[in-house]
């Protein structure tokens, strides 16, 4: 039994998926704080985690005063305290939209291996080619001989790509904040987030393993036989392990070369540019939301309201304040109600970089253009640049043997790369499973070349949203796992 169960602390979901949680009283000596509880797997038994940085009162309006000051319990600045936790009255409404926490064996989305396997085995063992089923037989995905898309020579001019190293990503969220600031992404407030109306152009999917390791999940899925076994096993795989592995995966618009959003827009509001970007023409968009329905990555966002001016959002959207409007980026249009929006690869920064190079009478060189997310990433997990520049960091990154593109089997050919996560740990289970893998040694050292010159780009698959934190910070603490 977990600590949360023993204390009677629960998290529950409303019909629309919105997350609610119990309150608890946390006491150290004579100091007691009433805080909401969000239950997370992997929390060590007998411990709680309490967030600092909330509870500020001075200089803030009432609606901005959120949470409690946890420093009251931080006696003598000791990380370990003798804490008493009790169930308290009330129910807290969390702004958390990441409700499905496990991959359930979909290892082609977040790929990982151990350092031992990485150093001793061919990439066919740990960076497997995705497969599709034909007549109940699995086949490696290859570029189709017949393609109904009208292709053009992508080697002419610039072709911008982005690479994300899952080894380096810590899930800190700096990229999400930078994206909001750079692209005037509206702040919608806690109640809208609970309705899954968040506007993040970039989210960070957080996954827990349902077995000891993610590769263990994949093996469990492979061992499933029959409908009955499938229902029972997948039901169990929805639950995270008590001591799971954790992986973070930033997900934004993949700027697919064969973008499914472009083919369904009835007014051609979204289209593909020669530089590899999927563009949005806001003044053409009529808000059908067909593009969002047809996006396999769920990265498009719809403006349900006119967030920058509607009085309902005055308390949560700083852009409605005279001072707050001064931080809006004048190079990016502020969208209005009924318009779809998404990641643009910071097209305004690309155009600025090209203009600077033009005024200097020189060609664009690697490093001239960056995105907001790649600029601020503290671990340098995000690389951006011109893929057609053979000496660029992005070209070299995409051609590394760790590079892959998730969901490449659906054939949308995106311009986002991910790198296999390598864990520096002793994991006999993972070594045994991946040593047995290797359904073909041909995942291709020239994966990057095929990705563009032959039109063999691929795709990503995190279908969750970021734990947004709009109003989610009232001293949230985490008792032990489920």
Give the role of each language-model region.
Residues 3, 28-30, 41-43, 54-56, ...:
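Short, flexible loop/turn elements at secondary-structure junctions
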Residues 19-23, 32-34, 45-47, 80-82, ...:
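Active-site lining segments that contact anionic ligands and/or coordinate catalytic metals
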Residues 145-146, 203-206, 210-248, 314-335, ...:
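Surface-exposed acidic, glycine/proline-enriched linker/cap segments
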Residues 157-160, 164-166, 170-186, 192-209, ...:
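Beta-propeller domains
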Residues 174-193, 203, 258-284, 290-310, ...:
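Iron-sulfur cluster-binding cysteine motifs and their immediate structural context
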Residues 199, 303-322:
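Flexible glycine/proline-rich, aromatic-decorated loop/lid segments
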Residues 320-323, 338-452, 460-467, 473-482:
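Long, compositionally biased charged/polar accessory segments in the mid-to-C-terminal portions
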């Amino acid at each position: 039994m977990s600590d949360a169960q023993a204390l009677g602390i629960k998290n529950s979901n409303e019909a629309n998926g919105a997350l609610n949680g119990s309150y608890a009283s946390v006491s150290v000596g004579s100091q007691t704080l009433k805080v909401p509880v969000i239950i997370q797997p992997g929390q060590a038994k007998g411990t709680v985690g309490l967030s600092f940085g909330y509870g500020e009162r001075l200089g803030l309006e009432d609606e901005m005063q959120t949470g409690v000051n946890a420093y009251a319990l931080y006696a003598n600045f000791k990380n370990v305290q003798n804490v008493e936790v009790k169930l308290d009255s009330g129910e807290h409404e969390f702004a958390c939209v990441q409700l499905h926490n496990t991959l359930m064996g979909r290892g082609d989305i977040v790929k990982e291996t151990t350092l031992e396997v990485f150093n001793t085995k061919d990439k066919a063992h740990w960076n497997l080619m995705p497969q599709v089923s034909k007549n109940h037989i699995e086949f490696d995905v290859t570029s189709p001989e017949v393609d109904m898309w009208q292709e053009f020579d992508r080697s002419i001019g610039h072709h911008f790509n982005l690479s994300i190293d899952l080894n380096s990503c810590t899930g800190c969220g700096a990229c999400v904040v930078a994206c909001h600031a750079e692209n005037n992404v509206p702040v919608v407030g806690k109640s809208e987030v609970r309705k899954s109306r968040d506007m993040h152009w970039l989210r960070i999917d957080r996954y827990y393993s349902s077995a000891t390791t993610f590769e263990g999940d994949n093996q469990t899925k492979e061992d499933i036989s029959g409908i009955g076994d499938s229902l029972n096993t997948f039901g169990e795989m929805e639950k995270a392990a008590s001591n799971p592995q954790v992986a973070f995966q930033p997900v934004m618009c993949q700027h697919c070369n064969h973008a499914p959003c472009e083919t369904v827009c009835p007014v051609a509001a979204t289209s593909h540019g020669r530089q590899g970007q999927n563009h949005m023409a806001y003044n053409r968009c009529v808000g059908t939301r067909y593009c969002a329905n047809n996006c396999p990555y769920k990265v498009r966002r719809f403006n349900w309201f006119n967030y920058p001016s509607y009085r309902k959002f005055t308390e949560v959207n700083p852009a409605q304040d005279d001072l707050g409007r001064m931080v809006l980026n004048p190079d990016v249009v502020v969208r209005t109600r009924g318009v779809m929006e998404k990641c643009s690869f910071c097209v305004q920064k690309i155009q600025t970089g090209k203009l600077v190079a033009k005024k200097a009478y020189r060609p664009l060189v690697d490093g001239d253009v960056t995105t907001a997310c790649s600029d601020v990433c503290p671990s340098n997990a995000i690389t951006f640049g011109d893929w057609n520049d053979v000496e660029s960091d992005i070209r070299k990154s995409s051609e590394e043997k760790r590079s892959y593109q998730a969901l490449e089997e659906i054939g949308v050919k995106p311009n986002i790369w991910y790198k296999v996560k390598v864990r520096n740990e002793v994991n006999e289970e993972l070594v045994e499973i991946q040593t047995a893998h290797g359904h073909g040694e041909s995942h291709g050292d020239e994966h990057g070349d095929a990705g563009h010159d032959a039109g063999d780009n691929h795709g990503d698959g995190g279908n969750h949203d970021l734990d947004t934190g709009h109003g989610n910070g009232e001293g949230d603490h985490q008792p032990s796992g489920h």
